[in-house]
């Protein structure tokens, strides 16, 4: 008989940024354990709150099904000797099965006859195995730093206080993480019943909400926060900034979400909104309120914020006033730092960068600034941006690191540089570049908006990549300098803006600016290989298959925009009817040429062409070579591959009718030359022999 199953683990406060991950992993792990144990069920739903992880399994079978286990033994021909006596192999197999050889059955297949043992295995009751399954699911959670507590030897992400396991209304007895299962559920610390018993799995989570004032359904809590926050913002004429990561964190911090609106003095709005938002979101987990949506030029920060309380107070005004008192000193600090910092122009802080170390072997932030300045000017020249403005932006790029605001609110680096540069009267492109130098900050982030910003952003990232590789600290598992993200940022900028830039030139220029600081003689090669490797993850995320990416990577094109054109062309080619046949032919040609140990002529000898099929292919290759020159010259690889698809018929005919490895050496070499020329046409774009069916 199928019943609902509940397991709830009551803990001390779980890390809010990990709560969803833990709950989803618990559900996935437990479902995998149920599948492995062959326990029928109709789905697993997870619940998570700050002090609990729980699962409910719908219609969980009360026992495993009975089954017949078959164990095949040796072939009959090997199981008996010439006199018909069991061999040692047969006897050993039979002993392992707990039978004698003459008790074994026979299994006949098209490959012969085998000894067979069949055993009926009774299914175990769910109550006897589910505790072990749950323990395994919890043991395999992604916990980086488990902890011990009290005098226990068990480890978990936080101390475990309660354990409840119910199968319908039956208590499943057992112990996990040193805690015995019982019917006790803990409620909210300050509301409802702090402790009560639960009679059946079906009561969960409703009983916890009704009696314990804890909303265990994570998604329901999140939905309430989103809906009520937007309503609260609309009530003050604004729109709430409900960044998903912050919403997730707040959802993980509260058991009973109560959304409230507070305000602060309008005089603080004279401070750049980024600094105010940083302290509201980062320090206090508040949601700022804006006048308009993102992207609207009229968007302004309003003197309100929304927060989520974990208690339903009879006097919410006191809760609101308390939060206003907490945030006010932080906003006052931001105001003070802003006013103080503006008393000195950014450029005056440049010498102070000598006191800040970028990396011991690579020098100070001032050294990095000098390199960025030079490299930004070089890149600006290549992409047609203003060279002098790019150099000026490079010079000022890191100066805001020496301001009080950025020292106190580190996430405002860049954006505060922009505001201070505007105050100093710097050109707008220069000021904007100080903020956009860090773009793109993450996958899918916006790119720098102008040429000056682009030059500085690329220069900063390339300097870091080349420098760290240059001292032999390429990322392996961890990536403390975020070189993967920096590499992808450079590639995205080049590809999406279509710049005709070559990584070989960029890396060489960046390397030259380090003087004798670098110790890795292969730094240029290493950096280019690393950056090209980032393409694999990027294009996979874009939906391109691995074999398409590998086909292009095999040619190692070092111009990112050119790489992009090749990937898209090969993807288009793969959908053509001729693609599979030509990919197979290219693979065959590659294998044939790999086995030939010798030199081939650059051109075929027309006089040695004998078969009609090889003459036709030779003519097609010659015509195609000339026809494709304009497409190759302009990088129109899609057009080139579409034309190359026309070679399917003469290629198929060649392999059907021509013996490549002829006895006549001259004839064989001529045919190999023809195939080599054919393959080289495709290799000018990609190695399509790597395409899979």
From Swiss-Prot:
GO terms for molecular function: arginine-tRNA ligase activity; ATP binding; glycine-tRNA ligase activity. GO terms for biological process: arginyl-tRNA aminoacylation; glycyl-tRNA aminoacylation. It catalyses: tRNA(Gly) + glycine + ATP = glycyl-tRNA(Gly) + AMP + diphosphate. Its EC number is 6.1.1.14. One of its GO terms (cellular component) is cytosol. Keywords: Aminoacyl-tRNA synthetase, ATP-binding, Cytoplasm, Ligase, Nucleotide-binding, Protein biosynthesis. It comes from the Bacteria. It is found in: Cytoplasm. Belongs to the class-II aminoacyl-tRNA synthetase family. This is Glycine--tRNA ligase beta subunit. The lineage of its organism: Bacteria, Pseudomonadati, Pseudomonadota, Gammaproteobacteria, Vibrionales. The gene is glyS.
